[in-house]
Amino acid sequence: MTFTVSTISAGVVRLAVEGELDAVTVPGLRKEIDKLSATSPKRVEIDLSSLRMVDSSGVGAIVSLYKRVRGQGGEVVVVGLRDQPLAIFRLLRLDRVFAI
């Protein structure tokens, strides 16, 4: 599991997640979320194009990021969803919550 945070422009941050996002890897993501939230970004793009699998704990971490950023007045966009992660987002109707 790899997490990469990069600044796209002033106030815009991209979080790229690669591999599998499950109960084992979520603690690492939560650390990145804490660091990212501390900067109070106006927009967070979550790049899931290299995410192969997500379980309920992974979805919970993504929703947690969404709530934190929205609570600070920011926007969260999910890009690159495909395969199993896309099916999970649709099943949970998160495609209605996130701009995908």
Roles of regions detected by a PLM:
Residues 20-97:
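Amphipathic alpha-helical interaction surfaces in cytosolic regulatory modules
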Residues 1-16:
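Short beta-strand/loop segment at the start of cytosolic alpha/beta domains
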